[in-house]
């Protein structure tokens, strides 16, 4: 289930990434929640879907989010997504630290 959530988050971020990512990262929690609610409400239409489960299916069914994104977004937008996600992840790294034990590598 976690991978589905990650996929949705990335899908939301990619729609924001084409120009508003800096502003999005500066929003407070209430503003961010409102923006994400608006974006997720537009996700189905953007992908030609009628509901969010269709969005999940379109973006996640191939198991390769990059490939799925490239079908719906330009290379530049996909690259912006990665940059934005990385920047935001670093600024909120403490929220994503669980389960990532450094030094105990799984080789």
UniProtKB/Swiss-Prot annotation:
Signal peptide boundaries: 1-19
An example Gene Ontology CC term for this record: extracellular region
Main location: secreted
Any one GO molecular-function label of the UniProt entry: iron ion binding
GO biological process, one term: innate immune response
Record field: compositional bias (Basic and acidic residues): 87-107
Sequence segments annotated as region (Disordered): 86-107
Keywords: Antibiotic, Antimicrobial, Copper, Disulfide bond, Fungicide, Immunity, Innate immunity, Metal-binding, Secreted, Signal
Disulfide bond positions: 25-60, 38-88, 49-54
Entry's localization field: Secreted
Function noted in UniProt: Has bacteriostatic activity against Gram-positive bacteria, but not against Gram-negative bacteria. Has fungistatic activity against some but not all fungi. Binds and sequesters copper and iron ions. Copper-chelating is crucial for antimicrobial activity against M.luteus.
Name assigned to this protein: Antimicrobial peptide microplusin
């Amino acid at each position: 289930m976690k991978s589905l959530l990650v996929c949705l988050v990335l899908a939301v971020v990619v729609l924001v990434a084409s120009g508003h990512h800096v502003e999005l990262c500066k929003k407070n929690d209430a503003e961010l929640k409102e923006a994400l609610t608006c974006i997720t409400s537009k996700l189905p239409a953007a992908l030609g879907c009628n509901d969010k489960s269709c969005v999940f299916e379109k973006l996640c069914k191939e198991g390769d989010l990059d490939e799925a994104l490239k079908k719906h977004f330009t290379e530049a937008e996909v690259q912006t997504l990665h940059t934005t996600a990385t920047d935001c992840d670093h600024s909120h790294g403490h929220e994503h630290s669980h389960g990532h034990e450094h030094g105990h590598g799984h080789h």
